[in-house]
Amino acid sequence: VLDYPKLKDAVVTHNHPSGGSFSVDDIKFLKRVPISELRVVSERGSYYIRRPKEWPQEINSSVKIENTIKDIKKELRPKYQKMYNKKEINKVERHQMFSDAVIRLFAERYGLDYGQEIHG
C-alpha cells in the first residue's frame, strides 16, 4: 500500500513498454495522489503530465475523468483508424499516436501541463 503523504509533490515515473502515453488509470492516480508530476518512459522517449493547482469541476472525480477520456477517445478514434486502414501507419504507431492525441487533447481542454520528450 502506498504511503500517500510521503508522495506529496513527488515526481512518479513508470514505464509503458508499448510506447503509449498515459492511461485512464494513470490520470486517476494523478488526481488521487498528492504528487506534482507523473512520467511514463518508453524506449522512444518519455511523457509527463503535471497536476493542476485545482482540478476543473468537469474532471474532479474518477468517474468524470473516465467519462471525459472515453468521450475524447470516441471523438479521435476514427482519424487514427482511418490512417491505419489506409496503411499509413501500423498498429503500434496507431496505438502510440492515438494515446498521445487523447491525453494531449484532455490536457489542453482542462489546463494540465503535458508533453513528450524524445530520447536520442
Where are these regions (language model features)?
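Divalent-metal-activated hydrolytic enzyme cores
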Residues: 35-120
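Short HxH-centered metal-ligating active-site micro-motif
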Residues: 1-34, 42-43
